């Protein structure tokens, strides 16, 4: 890292551009011939891709790239990591969309009033495989240094301003997740991190899940990815707090 950047930490996170190999925000293009798109829809393991109407749900997407392989005229993955949204429906992209919209009007005013300068989060792995959890841990390493913005993770929900949930929300963790969230003082935020947290991912239809937590609690930030890149996490949190804008 020191050899690549000239210093240990990335100096300006706003100027970060990921490699072309990184699969970030997809661009969809409509074609009259839907043969390839229909093939991609049939191939998608989570039902994230639809041919008619042409759309891709990032909240379900595993970013495996198979849709782009079989339907290159319809879908192309860019290296844009700015894919967080304050709403679940904001993760659904359509033909012609050039970015994932982040409407500041959908952010509760108390979030920016109370947490703009400092935010402590409690992470709950709700049946995750460890990949998203490792990426969240990486946000605080010497390279990304999320702590420079006054944002970090704490062990106790009593010390936290909000909860970050990863994993598909299994039944075994349902009660513990509720207890943890209730232990955080108001006002608080709720972040769903990773495709599994957003939709259940590959396990969406599993009987082992219990996603009823989302029936009574509305997330403030949805961060797709399988796993979610540290830059996606950082960009989403800073945009939620009003410390940067989605241009």
Predicted regions and their residues:
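Flanking helices and flexible, charged tails adjoining ferredoxin-like Fe-S electron-transfer domains
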Residues: 68-150
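Ferredoxin-type iron-sulfur electron-transfer modules and their immediate structural context
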Residues: 1-47
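Short amphipathic alpha-helical segments and helix-helix/interface helices
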Residues: 39, 111, 177-181
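Iron-sulfur cluster-binding cysteine motifs and their immediate structural context
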Residues: 28, 37-85
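Cofactor-cradling patches in redox/metallo enzymes
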Residues: 134-136, 144, 148-232
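Structural motif
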Residues: 30-31, 59, 166-169
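A charged, well-structured terminal subsegment
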Residues: 223-247
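Generic secondary-structure signature for well-ordered alpha-helical cores
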Residues: 113-116, 129, 182, 186, ...
């Amino acid at each position: 890292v020191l050899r690549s950047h000239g210093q240990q930490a990335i100096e300006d996170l706003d100027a970060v551009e990921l490699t072309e190999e990184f699969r970030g925000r997809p661009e969809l293009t409509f074609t009259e011939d839907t043969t390839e798109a229909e093939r991609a829809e049939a191939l998608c393991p989570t039902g994230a891709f639809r041919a008619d109407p042409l759309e891709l749900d990032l909240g379900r997407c595993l970013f495996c790239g198979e849709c782009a392989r079989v339907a290159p005229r319809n879908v192309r993955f860019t290296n844009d990591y700015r894919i967080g949204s304050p709403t679940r429906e904001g993760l659904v992209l359509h033909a012609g969309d050039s970015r994932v919209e982040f409407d500041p009007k959908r952010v509760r005013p108390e979030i920016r009033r109370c947490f703009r300068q400092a935010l402590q989060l409690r992470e709950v792995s709700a049946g995750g495989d460890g990949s998203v959890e490792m990426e969240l841990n990486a946000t605080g390493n010497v390279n990304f240094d999320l702590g420079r913005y006054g944002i970090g993770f704490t062990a106790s929900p009593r010390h936290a301003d909000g909860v970050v949930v990863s994993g598909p929300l299994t039944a075994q963790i349902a009660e513990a997740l509720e207890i943890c969230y209730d232990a955080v003082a108001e006002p608080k935020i709720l972040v769903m991190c990773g495709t599994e947290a957003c939709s259940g991912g590959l396990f969406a239809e599993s009987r082992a899940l219990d996603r009823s937590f989302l029936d009574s609690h509305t997330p403030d930030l949805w961060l797709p990815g399988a796993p979610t890149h540290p830059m996606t996490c950082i960009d989403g949190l800073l945009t939620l707090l009003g410390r940067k804008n989605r241009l």
